[in-house]
């Protein structure tokens, strides 16, 4: 049923893409059910200080930094399929152990293992998808993957919100086991794929070619800013703020993430079409503006609890459209900037910027949230606005054939 639904999202892609996207949707269901409530579990249920819980989240991302480098190198040399399967196996075993996490050091250890796993399955996933589709269709395939992921995330978030209760630790343990099972299920889908032929004619220089590409480094800097100040805060810290400051219940938090996913499902492929023939830097600048608007609304919700849920709904809507634009542009831009034979290394570097954002965002954000919540959201909005200005300045420095999303 999932395969049929994903297949109807966009025609003219290889069947193997639909198999992969179906696995993505299944895995996203488990992630959507568990991830928004991890910090709430560590802080509100297990009594771990918010700063320490944020450090555990940052350790997750730190574990993914080195794993991303290794995973992409393996993807370039022997193909991405084995890398993805190894990461999924580690994630499955770690989430099966997560119900036994009760202290800060255990949470930090589990976070590091999950980050290492993500360095394999999440970053290798992009290489696998890009190898399964022709270049002119990549932005559609990545947009479709985003839709598939949000189908799972939305339903999972709603399910998690209905199950989770801070008064009963067992409800969170159910979510973690559910997430482990969906990681294992995703592995079954990946195992069905015919592994793409590994590119053994890798361009000499490896990461030296990446660090010498100044326009690409500029794109990565903007990416770090957006992930740090927007994406990393949405799943990790916004639910804690919504519950403890705005006074929103767990079920309503899950419903907010369902709205986030439904909006992305409805708009992602349409936005992927809209950005065709348009400059990618302008699209990313608009992303930053929408992210900033989201956090200013979240800040307002904390000072207007009577209308807090409605304001958060408006905030999550702005974030959703920003995410649609970001996902339609970001990964295809990275692939188009990469020389032949180095797509894996470039995607690895983009994965590092993502992981670095998740190191900085939760660690600093959790500390700010504990001390001065308003400063967190105001500062995040300012960073997003600065990122929008910075990406516009990069436009003329990018290769001509990478500046515009191709038409299909």
Provide a role label for each language-model segment.
Residues 282-326:
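C-terminal transmembrane helical hairpin of 12-TM major facilitator-type secondary transporters
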Residues 11-61, 215-260:
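Helix-loop boundary and gating motifs at the non-cytosolic
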Residues 82-96, 180, 282-297:
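Structural signature of the two symmetry-related core transmembrane helices
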């Amino acid at each position: 049923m999932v395969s049929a639904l994903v297949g109807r999202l966009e025609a003219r892609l290889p069947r193997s893409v639909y198999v992969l996207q179906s696995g993505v949707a299944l895995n996203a269901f488990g992630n959507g059910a568990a991830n928004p409530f991890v910090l709430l579990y560590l802080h509100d249920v297990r009594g771990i200080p918010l700063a320490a819980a944020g450090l555990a989240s940052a350790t997750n991302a730190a574990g993914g930094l080195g794993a991303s480098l290794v995973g992409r190198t393996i993807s370039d040399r022997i193909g991405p399929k084995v890398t993805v399967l190894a990461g999924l196996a580690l994630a499955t075993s770690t989430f099966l152990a997560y119900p036994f996490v009760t202290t800060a050091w255990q949470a930090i250890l589990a976070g590091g293992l999950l980050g290492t796993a993500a360095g394999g399955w999440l970053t290798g996933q992009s290489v696998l998808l890009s190898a399964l589709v022709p270049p002119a269709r990549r932005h559609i395939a990545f947009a479709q993957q985003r839709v598939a992921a949000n189908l799972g995330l939305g339903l999972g978030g709603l399910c998690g919100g209905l199950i989770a209760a801070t008064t009963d630790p067992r409800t969170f343990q159910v979510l973690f086991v559910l997430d482990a099972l969906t990681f294992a299920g995703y592995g079954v889908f990946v195992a069905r794929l015919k592994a793409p032929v590994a590119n053994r004619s890798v361009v000499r220089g490896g990461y030296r070619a990446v660090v010498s590409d100044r326009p690409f480094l500029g794109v990565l800097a903007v990416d770090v800013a957006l992930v740090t100040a927007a994406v990393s805060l949405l799943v990790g810290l916004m639910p804690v703020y919504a519950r403890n400051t705005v006074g929103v219940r767990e079920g309503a938090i899950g419903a907010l993430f369902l709205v986030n996913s439904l909006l992305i499902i409805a708009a992602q492929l349409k936005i992927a079409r809209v950005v065709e023939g348009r400059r990618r830097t302008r699209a990313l600048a608009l992303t930053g503006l929408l992210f900033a608007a989201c956090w200013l609304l979240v800040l307002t919700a904390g000072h207007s609890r009577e209308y807090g849920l409605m304001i958060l709904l408006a905030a999550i809507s702005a974030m959703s459209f920003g995410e649609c634009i970001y996902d339609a542009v970001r990964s295809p831009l990275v692939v188009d900037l990469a020389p032949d034979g180095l797509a894996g290394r470039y995607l690895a570097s983009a994965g590092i910027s993502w992981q670095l954002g998740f190191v900085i965002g939760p660690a600093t954000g959790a500390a700010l949230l504990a001390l001065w919540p308003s400063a967190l959201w105001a500062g995040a909005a300012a960073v997003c606005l600065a990122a929008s200005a910075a990406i516009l300045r990069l436009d003329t420095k990018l290769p001509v054939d990478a500046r515009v999303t191709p038409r299909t």
